[in-house]
Amino acid sequence: MGVYLNPGNEKFAKAVQSEIYVDKTGLIEYTNQVINTVQRYVCVTRPRRFGKSMTADMLTAYYGKECDSRELFSGLKISQNAVFAQHLNQYPTIFLNMQEFLSRSKEIGQVIDRVRRMLLRELKNSYPDVDYFDDTDLVESLQDIYAATKQSFVIIIDEWDCVFREYQQDKKAQEEYLDFLRDFLKDKVYVALAYLTGILPIKKYGTHSALNMFDEFTMLDPGPLAEYVGFTEQEVEELCGRYQMDLAEIKNWYDGYSFPGESSVYSPRSVVNAMRFRKIGNYWNQTETFEALQWYIDLNFDGLRDDVLQMMAGKKIPVNTGSFTNDMTTFRTEDDVLTLLIHLGYLGYEEQNKYVFIPNAEVQSEYASAVTVSQWGDISKALKNSADLLLSLIHISEPT
């Protein structure tokens, strides 16, 4: 086993062995349907704390060679599927967490170079007998391996969008990164399955996307993967029974996301923490969410401040998500900001009527905190008074 090539199943095993593990292996049924097909390119985006990395670890454990995951998946939902054994541990699997590469590099060229060098080292160690045309070229080396072995790869990229979050103002770096991914993945015979996961959908430049071969499943439309976005009503009911927690309180605090076919989706990490600690409260990362939310509120595009107030009062606001370009800086209208907040988990989205809203009390408390320190001129005092009242009501509703 390697670090990036066939890294094994240990990370997913730790998740399964945790005090609370909710079985989401049914998602593998979908990836098994599209593997080795034209639809083999899958991009799933969700907010932080919604289990993206665990899903990536699950797929790595299931598909990756050089480990035996049969016992690990025994008793889980996917083990009952007719083609479970057909794909289990059958593919050389590449797993990349782009945030790790980014944190060790000073600029995007170093990120890409490090990915190439690390993968090439492990590929050459695992396939020493392949006649490489150019063993310094990642794409050509993968093509040579496929030509020699007829084995195609499962490629899983976690935090795929970190470049767009860390290099928000550097369009050249973003384009260089997209070009690398396109060259690495698009129309390559050695790709059995490409699975990208992150927070932001795939970046678009004008009407063109460098990665337009991907099917995308987002907070706007997760399609057939809706039940895997977060915890479902049934899953939360079972946890509440197990931990003797009040379902109505849990629903008030952590529910509120909904999609066609899945009317109640809960924030998974918050539910897990509420169960483990037997305490309902705000489990979002305070510093990260507070600072980010405050910045977006203070942009105040097209009357955003008034709409935030209305949503804090329980109203729904119409939104047009079509113009959003899938980054964190290119805002032309209030709708673009609202759409980003959907992807970040700060807003729920009602697809049928095209409305956004604050999904639950946990997120409401983040808005209340952000508003209290925002500089909104003459209405700042009124906003702060409203926020103080909301915070008071939220704290009153907390169980003692």
Tell where the protein language model's regions lie, with residue ranges.
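N-terminal pre-Walker A segment at the start of P-loop NTPase domains
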Residues: 7-29
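Conserved lysine of the Walker
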Residues: 52
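Flexible phosphate/Mg2+-sensing switch loops adjacent to catalytic phosphate-binding sites
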Residues: 62-89, 208
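Substrate-engagement module of ASCE P-loop NTPases
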Residues: 144-146, 175-194
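Amphipathic alpha-helical segments of the small helical/lid subdomains adjacent to P-loop NTPase cores
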Residues: 206-212, 217-274, 307-308, 312
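Conserved helicase/translocase motor-coupling segment
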Residues: 282, 286, 295-340
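Short, amphipathic alpha-helical interaction segments positioned at domain boundaries
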Residues: 361-389
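Residue-level detector of conserved catalytic or cofactor/ligand-binding positions
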Residues: 391-400
